[in-house]
């Protein structure tokens, strides 16, 4: 079995990276020629995930525009956190109100993801389903 839904946490202010994040949301910062968000989406695609839910709050219009202008080979739905920042737990809970799957992966786009993680994440999924666990960190 494989997990078909992924959540990407993109709502934060990125304060530790000021002044870089004063006008650009942290997920859209670039390393070389790729944003950290795009790097995250690319690994999720390699995992075979069918649907991505991405939450936004700070400078959300930039994230909306970025996703709209890219042609990612996966269905991406953007969820606005609302009138106030919900923090990590609130953002996850808010996104889970928009889908039915009980099993999902959660990604922080400020982690530098590369293809070497695909095998490790797949092993975690296998372990999760084999042992009928509630969650795996």
Regions found by a protein language model. Name each.
Residues 1-8, 16, 34-108, 114:
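Conserved N-terminal catalytic core of the sugar/cofactor nucleotidyltransferase
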Residues 28, 78, 135-137:
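Conserved beta-strand scaffold positions in the cores of enzyme catalytic domains, especially
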Residues 115-137:
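Conserved donor-nucleotide/metal-binding helix-loop-beta segment in metal-dependent transferases, i.e.
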